């Protein structure tokens, strides 16, 4: 049997073909898995469980079919869907995990996280993250009318896009470094959690990295995004494989 890991699908009404690909994945591949882990950014944006969305409803229904069949599905909130709450999770049969967390995977402790906590060189983002993860901020935001939340989310997205565009027009190497994980934080994270395997998403740079941390040989697996194709990590007792999924 195999455990499946995905992240950064960024499901959005503007890209229905990716939602269709995910629904097909849930129907055709996930039912034979031991478990499914979604490590954040399942959705492009999430401003509350009460937001009307036929696509999100279809995803919840498909996930519930999967979990009702006996395949557990776990979710770690990402930087795009950190407001996804227990109401939607119940509808989808998802079990929300803390970010980060350690699980036992075929006899091996493995650290899971979305991945944005590793990008410590992006100081403005880390400040924004700290603000928006504050329970008081979230309660106040979710208490606003839907129209106000939509306007806030649109403004935040425009600000983020403008900042990234400005950074790209500058030193490309600096942009790549700032938006990727910080090596020192990766090392510290391995040591802090006492593991030698880490799985995360967020950076959209799928790869399997071998490194040394705290005097131990470690493996950092980065999941891919679903903008052009699907990306899935398959793990079993013998190892792991990072695969792509065609939209065809």
Curated annotation (Swiss-Prot):
GO terms for cellular component: cytoplasm; extrinsic component of plasma membrane. Its EC number is 3.6.1.54. Its cofactor is Mn(2+). It is a peripheral membrane protein. It comes from the Bacteria. It is found in: Cell inner membrane. The keyword Iron-sulfur does not apply. One of its GO terms (molecular function) is manganese ion binding. Keywords: Cell inner membrane, Cell membrane, Hydrolase, Lipid A biosynthesis, Lipid biosynthesis, Lipid metabolism, Manganese, Membrane, Metal-binding. Mn(2+) 1 binds at residues 8, 10, 41, 204. InterPro entries: Calcineurin-like_PHP_ApaH, LpxH-like, Metallo-depent_PP-like, UDP-diacylglucosamine_Hdrlase. Mn(2+) 2 binds at residues 41, 79, 114, 202. It is an enzyme of class 3 (hydrolase). Binds 2 Mn(2+) ions per subunit in a binuclear metal center. Substrate binds at residues 79-80, 122, 160, 171, 202. Pathway: Glycolipid biosynthesis; lipid IV(A) biosynthesis; lipid IV(A) from (3R)-3-hydroxytetradecanoyl-[acyl-carrier-protein] and UDP-N-acetyl-alpha-D-glucosamine: step 4/6. HAMAP family: LpxH. PANTHER family: UDP-2,3-DIACYLGLUCOSAMINE HYDROLASE (PTHR34990:SF1), UDP-2,3-DIACYLGLUCOSAMINE HYDROLASE-RELATED (PTHR34990). Hydrolyzes the pyrophosphate bond of UDP-2,3-diacylglucosamine to yield 2,3-diacylglucosamine 1-phosphate (lipid X) and UMP by catalyzing the attack of water at the alpha-P atom. Involved in the biosynthesis of lipid A, a phosphorylated glycolipid that anchors the lipopolysaccharide to the outer membrane of the cell. Belongs to the LpxH family. This is UDP-2,3-diacylglucosamine hydrolase. It comes from Stenotrophomonas maltophilia (strain R551-3). The gene is lpxH.
């Amino acid at each position: 049997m195999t455990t499946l890991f995905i992240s950064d699908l960024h499901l959005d009404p503007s890209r229905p073909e990716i939602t269709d690909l995910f629904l097909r994945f849930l129907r055709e591949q996930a039912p034979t898995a031991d478990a499914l882990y979604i490590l954040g950014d399942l959705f492009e944006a999430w401003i509350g469980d009460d937001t009307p969305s036929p696509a999100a409803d279809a995803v919840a229904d498909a996930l519930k079919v999967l979990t009702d069949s006996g395949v557990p599905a776990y979710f770690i909130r990402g930087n795009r869907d950190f407001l996804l709450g227990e109401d939607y999770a119940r509808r989808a049969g998802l079990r929300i995990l803390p970010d980060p967390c350690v699980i036992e995977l075929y006899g091996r402790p493995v650290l899971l996280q979305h991945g944005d906590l590793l990008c410590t060189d992006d100081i403005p983002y880390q400040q924004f993250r700290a603000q928006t993860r504050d329970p008081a901020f979230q309660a106040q935001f979710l208490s606003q009318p839907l129209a106000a939340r939509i306007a806030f989310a649109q403004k935040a997205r425009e600000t983020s896009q403008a900042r990234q565009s400005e950074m790209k027009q500058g030193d490309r190497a600096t942009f790549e470094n700032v938006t990727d994980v910080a090596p020192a934080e990766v090392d510290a994270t391995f040591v802090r959690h006492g593991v030698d395997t880490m799985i995360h998403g967020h950076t959209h740079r799928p790869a399997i990295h071998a490194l040394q941390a705290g005097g131990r040989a470690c493996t950092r697996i980065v999941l891919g995004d679903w903008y052009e194709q699907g990306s899935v990590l398959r793990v079993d007792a013998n190892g792991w494989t990072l695969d792509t999924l065609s939209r065809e």
